Amino acid sequence: AELPQGLWVRPRL
């Protein structure tokens, strides 16, 4: 997975 370091707030639960 290529996710930017910063968009890790509020995971899709």
UniProtKB/Swiss-Prot annotation:
It is found in: Secreted. Keywords: Amidation, Neuropeptide, Secreted. Its main location: secreted. GO terms for cellular component: extracellular region. GO terms for biological process: neuropeptide signaling pathway. It comes from the Eukaryota. The modification Leucine amide is found at L13. Belongs to the pyrokinin family. Myoactive. This is Pyrokinin-4. The lineage of its organism: Eukaryota, Metazoa, Ecdysozoa, Arthropoda, Hexapoda.
